Each structure stands twice: as C-alpha cells, then as structure tokens.
Amino acid sequence: MNFDILTLFPEMFDGPFNNSIIGKARDRGLIDINLIDIRDYTTDKHNTADDYPYGGGAGMVMKVEPIYRALTDVRSKRKGEYPVVLLSPQGKTLDQNLVKSLSKHDGLILICGHYEGVDERVRQIFSPLEISIGDYVVTGGEIGAIVLVDAVSRMIPGVLGDERSKVEDSFYNGILDYPHYTRPRVYQNLKVPDVLLSGNHGLIEKWRKKQALKRTLIRRPDLLKNKKLTPEEEELLEEAKAEIEGEYND
C-alpha cells in the first residue's frame, strides 16, 4: 500500500516511519511512504507556502496553489484508488472501522494541515475526506498522519509478525483488549492468574474473552451499546457484570 504525504515538515516523520513495525514493513516492501514537501511546489524565491488570512486574525493559512500543484503531480503518477485525506480537527474522528475501510484502498494521499489550516479552496477543489484523531489540539496534521499510517498499516497482511496480534488488539473487534502477563509469575505479591498457567487453551480463551468484555464494560461501556454479541459473549458479559457488582459490594 502506498501513502503519499503532503507536508510542510517532512522531517517530522523520520523517527516514527523508520523504526519498529512501520520501518520493517517499509524494508520488506509491504508499504511505501512518499513524503512530499509542499514548499517544493512553490514558485517564489522564498518558497512561500503560507500567508496571512484575509479578513485578519491570528496565525497563517496554508496557500492553495502549492497544495494544488503537489496533489495534481502525485495524482498523475498513481493508478488505482487513492482517496485524498485532509488531516483536520474538523474531520470525522478516526476509529477502527474507518481504519479498516481505508486499508482496502490501493493507497492514500494525505494532506497535513498546519498553522490555522488550509485555504478553504483546497476543500472546494478536491473534496477530501477530512479526518481528526480526536478532540484536542496538536501541532499539526503531521501527528495525525503518523497515527493514521500506523493504524492502517497494521491492517495490511504481513505487516504484523503474528496476524493474531491484529485480531486481538483493542478496538479491532469493537471492544478493549484483555489483560496481558509475562514472567515472573509473582511480583510484589501480585500473581499471574492461575488459568493462564493451566495449559488449557479453551479455558484461557474463555477467560480472555470475559476479561475483555469486563474491561470494556468498566472503561468504555459505550462500545457495547451497538455491539452484536454471540450467545457465548452474552453469557460471559453477564458473568462479568456479576463479578463487577460483587467487587463493588465488597
């Protein structure tokens, strides 16, 4: 899968995209990340890619012309489905369902908003899919692009060393992940649950499902409102509710 990222600050991506899972995926040719410096598409000697807003106000606005040239150039080199995504606080909040949907395309063209945002004509010309990573303020769309690329890349076959990791991640199946443990068995009088040491894979799987439902019920009950549960999951959820009530009463 290809990611074309239009940005004023390509150096912001060096660390996140050259290490860990993303770095390995790039080395193996599973994903390709193309960083496009918007300033390379300016025409004046100062490489001006932003300007003061009409009507006054604080901050600067990213100019439409260099973004148009950069995006048009990228599109001319790509074949297939390449939706244009604008990282913006005004966009749809990124969640796992959206991540899965985005991963089905041949690639994505990402525009990283910065300063006070992009000239409105970028939206009018390209009608991008606007995506936000949450209701809070960060330095620029570059941070959102890093999150999006990481999340989408995990959906691509072969990127994860063990495909089970993808399925067991929080949110992949609409609920939170179950608790994880490793050695030692006991630390500061805190013990690993006996079931995980039993070797009984059926019991372990059942325990993990119930713990995932229990954790979701405690921390993110909203996720369960529209979640379609299997009969087994419904039974485990009732058991989890009883356990929570018992812990509360104790």
UniProtKB/Swiss-Prot annotation:
Enzyme Commission no: 2.1.1.228
Enzyme class label: transferase
A Pfam family annotated for this UniProt entry: tRNA_m1G_MT
SUPFAM superfamilies listed in its UniProt record: alpha/beta knot
Keywords (A to Z) from UniProt: Cytoplasm, Methyltransferase, S-adenosyl-L-methionine, Transferase, tRNA processing
Annotated binding of S-adenosyl-L-methionine, by residue: G113, I133, G134, D135, Y136, V137, V138
Enzymatic reactions: guanosine(37) in tRNA + S-adenosyl-L-methionine = N(1)-methylguanosine(37) in tRNA + S-adenosyl-L-homocysteine + H(+)
CDD domains to which the protein is assigned, alphabetical: TrmD-like (cd18080)
Listed GO MF terms: tRNA (guanine(37)-N1)-methyltransferase activity
Highest taxon listed in the record's lineage: Bacteria
InterPro entries documented for this protein: Alpha/beta_knot_MTases (IPR029028), tRNA_m1G_MeTrfase_C_sf (IPR023148), tRNA_m1G_MeTrfase_TrmD (IPR002649), tRNA_m1G_MTases_N (IPR029026), tRNA_MeTrfase_TRMD/TRM10 (IPR016009)
Disulphide-bridged cysteine pairs: none
GO BP term, example: tRNA N1-guanine methylation
Localisation: Cytoplasm
Coiled-coil regions listed: none
GO cellular component, as recorded: cytosol
NCBIfam families per the UniProt record, alphabetical: PRK00026.1, trmD
Annotated family: Belongs to the RNA methyltransferase TrmD family.
Subunit field text: Homodimer.
Functional note: Specifically methylates guanosine-37 in various tRNAs.
Protein name: tRNA (guanine-N(1)-)-methyltransferase
Source organism of the structure: Halothermothrix orenii (strain H 168 / OCM 544 / DSM 9562)
Gene encoding the protein: trmD
